[in-house]
A protein has these predicted regions:
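Broad gene-expression machinery/nucleic-acid interaction feature
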Residues: 95, 136, 158, 199, ...
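Short loop/turn segments at secondary-structure transitions that flank enzyme active sites
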Residues: 104, 145, 167, 208, ...
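Dual-mode signal for accessory low-complexity, basic/Gly-rich regions
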Residues: 154-155, 170-240
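Generic beta-strand hydrophobic packing signal
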Residues: 86, 171, 202, 263-265
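Charged, compositionally biased interaction regions
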Residues: 213-214, 219-290
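Active-site and channel-lining beta-strand-loop segments
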Residues: 157-171, 265
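Glycine-rich nucleotide phosphate-binding loop and flanking beta-alpha elements
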Residues: 35-37, 210, 244
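Active-site bordering "gate/hinge" segments
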Residues: 1-156, 164, 269-275, 280-290
């Protein structure tokens, strides 16, 4: 199986008869990351449900979908589908806008109970891919934001990104900026390949069972952080690279996932997240003690 950082690798889809078997199945439980693969889309289009299980046993218990999460996620899905422009700001200097509607909204609530639905045990996250060329502005990673892919670490120093027409045109900062540039450059297929620097899926987390501090509590083992870091309520997840999962044409391994704290998110000028706190009551789900 491919490592955590190798997204879009064909894996089991290459095995004779496997694709046909999965397309005929009701549900498949992958224990690796099948996202951005062609075979996954084929199976989902055929109606197969997928529940990805890639986190540690303690986290599977803690992050299991609480009562009301699916209802809140479906509400958020409706809001995001109706949105045409998103603006993301922060006191750290982020001011990013993008248009949406060209690609589907993808929603996870922690279980796969609908035909053709993909989910992640521990999920509670929503995202879409921005319309081609529409993302523009500045994104600032601040200390405490999380690089969960390809690394598994809190950001230590500010990283300033300039985004122009859907691509990151400049990366400034110290160690964290160097780590980002080196990874994305290493994923280029040629000198002129800019796909790793494209803006990929953008969205936010809503699972009250997750918390920002879990990475500090559990250490930098990806198995303990794959879901929790992406789904804690009010984070804005910025990413780079592929968009094939949404039906786009960018197929690159240069994927970078950064759940950001303290951002404000506006859907068509209406605030749903204020400085990292969900303020739309219909997106807020009570935490269950476990």
């Amino acid at each position: 199986l491919p490592s955590w950082t190798k997204v879009g690798v064909a894996t089991v889809g290459k095995c004779k008869g496997t694709l046909e078997a999965m397309k005929a199945a009701d549900i498949v439980l992958p224990f690796h990351v099948p996202l951005f693969t062609g075979w996954l889309k084929e199976c989902m289009d055929a109606g197969t449900r997928f529940l990805m299980v890639i986190d540690g046993p303690e986290d599977l218990e803690q992050l299991a979908s609480p009562r009301g999460l699916k209802h809140a996620m479906k509400y958020a899905e409706g809001r995001y589908k109706a949105t045409r422009e998103v603006r993301v700001t922060s006191d750290a200097g982020t001011d990013l806008t993008y248009a949406c509607g060209e690609y589907p909204v993808m929603t996870q609530w922690g279980f796969a109970d609908e035909p053709g639905h993909f989910d992640h045990w521990g999920g509670g996250h929503i995202h879409t891919f921005p319309d081609e060329g529409s993302a523009n502005g500045t994104v600032v990673f601040q200390p405490g934001d999380i690089v969960i892919l390809p690394y598994c670490r809190y950001v230590q120093d500010e990283v300033w990104l300039e985004v122009r027409d859907g691509f990151i045109s400049q990366v400034d900062g110290g160690l964290d900026a160097k780590l980002m540039r080196d990874w994305l450059d290493d994923c280029k297929l040629s000198e002129g390949d800019q796909d790793p620097y494209a803006v990929s899926h953008l969205g936010w987390g809503m699972d009250p069972q997750a918390a920002w501090h879990y990475l500090g509590l559990n250490g930098d083992d990806p198995e303990r952080n794959r879901a929790a870091t992406r789904v804690f309520p009010g984070n804005f997840l910025f990413s780079t690279g592929p968009n094939t999962q949404g039906g786009g044409k960018r197929n690159t391994k240069g994927h970078y996932d950064v759940p950001m704290r303290d951002c404000s998110v506006m859907l068509d000028n209406e605030v749903i997240i204020d400085a990292g706190r969900l303020v739309d009551d219909d997106m807020i789900v009570p935490r269950e003690p476990r």
